Structure formats: structure tokens, C-alpha cells
Amino acid sequence: MNDLVDTTEMYLRTIYDLEEEGVTPLRARIAERLEQSGPTVSQTVSRMERDGLLRVAGNRHLELTTKGRAMAIAVMRKHRLAERLLVDVIGLPWEEVHAEACRWEHVMSEDVERRLIKVLNNPTTSPFGNPIPGLLDLGAGPDASAANAKLVRLTELPSGSPVAVVVRQLTEHVQDDIDLITRLKDTGVVPNARVTVETSPAGNVIIIIPGHENVTLPHEMAHAVKVEKV
């Protein structure tokens, strides 16, 4: 696959990531996430707009078109199926999984996806708890995207007192920080783990697990962790 297609798919998935996290997709956010210059991002966004993959709204918000969203969903589906394979079958260390899946997402065919779904026993979420979108497009399912109604972001929890929660999702942005995802794994902050959280006066979120050192997340990262209240 050529670099142009890779770049397009990376941009589409990044916009999809931002939407999942509840962050407004702007060119500045893409520049931060992909570590690219402002002019490079603007040029790529303009090309993608000409190609009918997105539109730039009046408030500079990037909106995926129907065509662009379908492509973004397909890329994310491949990414999260790859993550499942890398963890469940290959046994790759958690902190290496996201970066490796970022490579696989650009080269996996739909035929391989369908075979993976069977081999992996019809998964609906990634190892990090995130829903695998677009399964129905492959004739598989159920689609897990609607299973998030009870979930809240760590930043949405009330401050002032400890709150017991179950960790459900660590988004792509969290996984992209190797030091952080390693620390979360080592302290047991993984999907389905029960933890206690507190919000500090500075707005950071402190995760408390008995027998482990507390983990403090800055607001940006806490926003990217979804939990369910106990």
C-alpha cells in the first residue's frame, strides 16, 4: 500500500479516535496526535476534502462524509481485530500492541478480517475494551458500538470524594503513550478491573488500587478512559 493511502487512513482513524474520545476534531488536534506540522496537516485535509472524505465546517470542525466514515470504520475495525490477534494468539506485550496494529490496519484484507473473526471466536471489543466497529458490514456481529450507554469518562465523575468504578475502555490515545499504558498494566488498571478514583484539586484523576502505587492521570488522559460506576 502506498504512503498516500496510509496517510489518508491515518487521518481518518485519528478523526474517528477524537470523536470516540469526545474531542472536537480540528486540524490542530491531528497535528498533535500525528506529530505533523500545521501546513502538512492543512494540505492533507484539503486533499481529503477534495476527495470527498471529509468537510471543514464553519467552526473549523472536521466532519467525516458518509464515504470517509465508512473508510474510518473499516480501518478501526482492522486495527482492533489486529490488536485481538496480537494479544490473544501471538501474546505480544500490551505496550507494543497498539503500534503494531497501526501497521496491520493498512494491509489487512476483508477476507482476512472474516477469518480472524472466526479464529478469535467473534470478538466485539479490543483487548483494551474498545468496541470493534463495523462488524455488521462483514456479516458478523453483534456490533458492540451501542454498548457504551452506561459508561462515563473519568473526568465526568464527581469530585471531592472517592468513587468506585470498573475500568471498561482505554482509548487509542492512552495506548499511544507507551509509558502510561505500561504503568496502567503493571498496576492492574485494565478492562474489567475494579478501582477507586479521586479527582484532585488540580483536576487530575488519581486511580487507587490496594497493594499498588497510585496512578495519577492528567485531565487529557483521564478524559480518554471510560469506566462504569459500581
Curated annotation (Swiss-Prot):
Annotated S-S bridges: none
TM regions (residue ranges): none
Subcellular localization(s) per the UniProt record: Cytoplasm
Top-level lineage group: Bacteria
Domain HTH dtxR-type as annotated: residue spans: 4-65
Pfam families: DtxR (PF18357), Fe_dep_repr_C (PF02742), Fe_dep_repress (PF01325)
Keyword line: Cytoplasm, DNA-binding, Iron, Repressor, Transcription, Transcription regulation
Family from the record: Belongs to the DtxR/MntR family.
PANTHER family from the UniProt entry: IRON (METAL) DEPENDENT REPRESSOR, DTXR FAMILY (PTHR33238), IRON-DEPENDENT REPRESSOR IDER (PTHR33238:SF10)
The protein's role, per its UniProt record: Metal-dependent DNA-binding protein that controls transcription of many genes involved in iron metabolism.
Assembly description: Homodimer.
Protein name per the record: Iron-dependent repressor IdeR
Organism: Mycobacterium leprae (strain TN)
Classification of source organism: Bacteria, Bacillati, Actinomycetota, Actinomycetes, Mycobacteriales
